[in-house]
Amino acid sequence: MNYAETILPEFDREMANTRKVLERVPENKLDWQAHPKSHTIGWNANHLAEILGWVEGMLTATSWDFAPVGGEPYQSPKLTSWREILDLFDRNVAAARKAIAAVKGDQLTQPWSLLKAGTPLFTMPRATWMRSFVLNHLIHHRAILCVYLRLNDIPVPGMYDPSGDE
């Protein structure tokens, strides 16, 4: 069994669950935040939409410098409409799925590094990055967004079983 055959069923389930949550995000609450030190609903929704945009580069390049010396630092999207957020999410899901399906041989055991100004912050095998930096990271922010929805009396969709709202 290759990597795609083992990870894509889980990937598809988690992306469908994430989309269900993003579909509930109200545009009039994008600026809402639970605490002054917390990110807003909009920031979390944008982050969920962007995370999968990192997959192709992670699987094909050896590193990513999100703040290169002499270059422009990476900027997270700041989309302000529900439709734009969902469209970015859908595009990134499709691109990530295609990149995962194309993984060959020892590609996942090869190291990949996250850099800041040329300095490695972390270096791990690509498979570890996929699990922690992509899937676990996405599920973490999805859970935060679910709490934010709940705090705003917005029905939370079930992920693995029906939610208290279903």
Task: Label every model-predicted segment.
Residues 1-9:
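Short, charged, low-complexity loops and linkers
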Residues 8-19, 29-73, 114-166:
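Short, contiguous alpha-helical
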Residues 24-31, 99-109, 150-156:
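Surface-exposed helix-capping loop/turn segments at secondary-structure junctions
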Residues 76-114, 125-142, 147:
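Acidic/histidine-rich alpha-helical segments that form the ligand environment
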